[in-house]
Amino acid sequence: MKNTCGILLNLFLFIGCFLTCSASNTPKVQVHSGEIAGGFEYTYNGRKIYSFLGIPYASPPVQNNRFKEPQPVQPWLGVWNATVPGSACLGIEFGSGSKIIGQEDCLFLNVYTPKLPQENSAGDLMNVIVHIHGGGYYFGEGILYGPHYLLDNNDFVYVSINYRLGVLGFASTGDGVLPGNNGLKDQVAALKWIQQNIVAFGGDPNSVTITGMSAGASSVHNHLISPMSKGLFNRAIIQSGSAFCHWSTAENVAQKTKYIANLLGCPTNNSVEIVECLRSRPAKAIAKSYLNFMPWRNFPFTPFGPTVEVAGYEKFLPDIPEKLVPHDIPVLISIAQDEGLIFSTFLGLENGFNELNNNWNEHLPHILDYNYTISNENLRFKTAQDIKEFYFGDKPISKETKSNLSKMISDRSFGYGTSKAAQHIAAKNTAPVYFYEFGYSGNYSYVAFFDPKSYSRGSSPTHGDETNYVLKVDGFTVYDNEEDRKMIKTMVNIWATFIKSGVPDTENSEIWLPVSKNPADLFRFTKITQQQTFEAREQSTMAIMNFGVAYHYQNILNLMCQMT
C-alpha cells in the first residue's frame, strides 16, 4: 500500500512539474491589445523558432463592419491563444470549382521569430519580412506560406497575413458609401499593426520588406504606389505579377456589385440601401456570388480586385497605377520562365483543349480578360481570331500546341505588365530596381503537384515555382534532392541579402545589374538557369522573354479599344 501511495505521489508530482514547466516554457509576448501565448516550430534543418499564430490585427469585419474599412482591434482580457491559425477569409477553395471555405471573421496574422527580445543581450532588432499571399484576390491565406527555409540561418522576423477576398474584400458602389479596396486596406492595417507591435517579437519596424507572389505581387506593387502605405515598409520583393498586369485592376466593379445586390434580393438604385441590405445577407452567399463572373474554368482571374477609388476620405488607389509615383525604395522583381504553363495545364484537364478549340471566340476574352475592355462583340471575336493566328497559325489548340497556349498567357498576363512595372519604378526612383527570370525546374513545381503525369524535372518553371524554394508551401512534400536543396540555399541567399542590404546576392553584385532608369535603354536582368548559374543579360524589351509578342498583342488590344 505504501509503495502504491508512493508511486501515485511521484506520478502526481511529475504531472504537476510537467504542467508547470510546460506553462513556464510557453513563449509570451505583450502587444498593444493584450498578451499573446505562442508555441514552437522547427525550420527545414531543425532550428527551433517561436510561432505566434492567428493574432487579430483588426476587429472582425462582420455585421455592421462588413464592407467597412478595417476597424481597430479591440483589447482582450487574459492571454490570447496563438498556437493555432486563425480562420482563412471566405473564398473559393482552389481547384474545387465552387466550394466556399473560410470565415468572415478572418483578419489575423502570424509571426515567426528565432528569438525574443529577452534572449537578445545585444538588444539588436531583426529585419522584418511580411508575406502577402496570392490567389487572384479570391482564395488563399497567410498560413500556407512558412519561413522554414528562410529562417534556417537568418535572424529575421517573418509575418504572414490574411485579408478579405472576393466580393467581401473588393466590392464597391463606385462612390463614398463603399469606395472599394477593403482587402488592400486590410493589408495596410496589418502593416500598421507591425509598425506598432513588431518590436515585441524582436523585429525592427524601420527595416520591413514586403513580398508577394501573383496577386500578392500585385498587392506589393499597389502598396508601392499607394499614398496610404507610404512609410510602412522599406523594401519590396515582387514575384510573378504587378499592378500593371491586366488582371490586377478589376473593371466595372460598381456594376458587378449592383448585380450581386439584385441576385440576393437587394435594392440596386441607392448605394446606402445596397450596402445595408448586403450586410443582412449570409456571408457565404455573397462569397459564392463571385462565381457568376467566372463563366468558364475560373476565368477571368479577378472579377473583383483593386479598383480606382473615385470618392472617399482616404483613397488607397486615387488613380490608375500607371499614373501614380512609386515610393523610392529598393525593389526586387522576378518572373518565371514559363508563367503560363500552370494555366495551360489546368486548361488541358478534363477535355479542356477541345472545349477551348470549339469555343475560342467565347472563352478567350475571359481567359485574357478583355471581355469588358472590348464591348463590341464583333471586335471581341476579331481580336480572338487575330490572337489565335499570331500564336497558333492554323493549328488547333491541343497537347501539341500547349506551349503556344502557355506563351500566350505568359505574355498577356505576366510578361508585359511585370516588365513595364520594373521600367516604371526604375524611371521614377533613385533607389535600385533589380529584375531576374527564374529558369530552374525541380521537384517543387505546381505542375508536378497538380498534374504529375505531364511534368518532368528540367522542363519549365511556371507561375509561383520560385516561391517554393524560399518559403515552405503547405501541402508540398519536402523532397530530399541535392539539386533542390542547393536551389533553396541559392534563393534564400538572394532574398536574405536583399532584405539586409537592398541588393540581392551581394557576393555576385557584378551579375545583378539594376534596371536602367531610361526606358529606352536595354533591359537589364539576371537569368537563373537550370544549371543554377547566374547570367547577366541586357536585351531590348522587344526581345526579352518574348516581350515582343506581348507588345504585338497589346497593340492589338489598344487598336480594338480605340475602335470601340
UniProtKB/Swiss-Prot annotation:
The active site is at S214, E339, H463. Keywords: Disulfide bond, Glycoprotein, Hydrolase, Serine esterase, Signal. Disulfide bonds join C89-C106, C266-C277. Glycans are attached at N81, N269, N371, N404, N443. InterPro entries: AB_hydrolase_fold, CarbesteraseB, Carboxylesterase_B_AS, Carboxylesterase_B_CS, Type-B_Carboxylest/Lipase. Residues 1-23 form the signal peptide. SUPFAM superfamilies: alpha/beta-Hydrolases (SSF53474). Its EC number is 3.1.1.1. GO terms for molecular function: carboxylesterase activity. It catalyses: a carboxylic ester + H2O = an alcohol + a carboxylate + H(+). It comes from the Eukaryota. CDD domains: Esterase_lipase. PANTHER family: CARBOXYLESTERASE. Belongs to the type-B carboxylesterase/lipase family. This esterase confers insecticide resistance. Overproduction of nonspecific esterases is a common mechanism of resistance to organophosphate insecticides. This is Esterase FE4. It comes from Myzus persicae (Green peach aphid). The lineage of its organism: Eukaryota, Metazoa, Ecdysozoa, Arthropoda, Hexapoda.
